[in-house]
Amino acid sequence: MRTGSFPVCLRITPYGNGGFHMIEKVYCMEEIAAIIIRHTFDKDGIEFVTPGDFSQQMAYMHHPKGHQIIPHFHNKVERTVHFTQEILMIKKGKLRVDFYDGKCRFQKSAVLEEGDVILLAGGGHGFEILEETVMIEIKQGPYAGDADKTRFEPA
């Protein structure tokens, strides 16, 4: 678990089609705790929303019919992963994600709806399911079992 106090503020990234809350970045001080791509976001081409040094990369892609992506392989590259970063894709329903600082203190919440995608990049987090929810979770492996996370009671 990371130590220190991380006050959280919500910053809204100003790209998209002018809609409200298109891509949101939740910060713990200067560290990104989460990136949310709202289901209303739309932009032609490829938009990487994560910094290049994140161990989990997330991009939004919108291509026209007939566009081709050149066949390719991904090469074996040794990487070091210090913290698990997970992506949740909300297929159905609504949930609230609560963000916590390094001292297990609640900081802020965000509501996710059908079609939203979130990358949980750092800090503590918990969820309350507001409607029946179906989601897909994607994270790095190999699975580390109980060593992967620390559960806590909010301060």
Pin down the residues of each PLM region:
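Short, positively charged low-complexity motifs
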Residues: G4, V8-L10
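A short, N-terminal "cap"/entry segment at the start of jelly-roll beta-barrel domains
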Residues: L10-Y60, A155
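Double-stranded beta-helix
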Residues: I23, G126-A155
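Conserved short histidine dyad/triad with adjacent acidic residue
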Residues: M61-H82
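Glycine- and acidic-residue-biased ligand/ion/polar-headgroup-sensing regions
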Residues: P64, F83-D98
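Short beta-strand His + acidic residue motifs that chelate non-heme Fe in jelly-roll/DSBH
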Residues: P71, V97-D98, I118-L120, H125-L130, ...
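Short acidic-glycine-tyrosine-enriched beta hairpin
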Residues: D101-G122
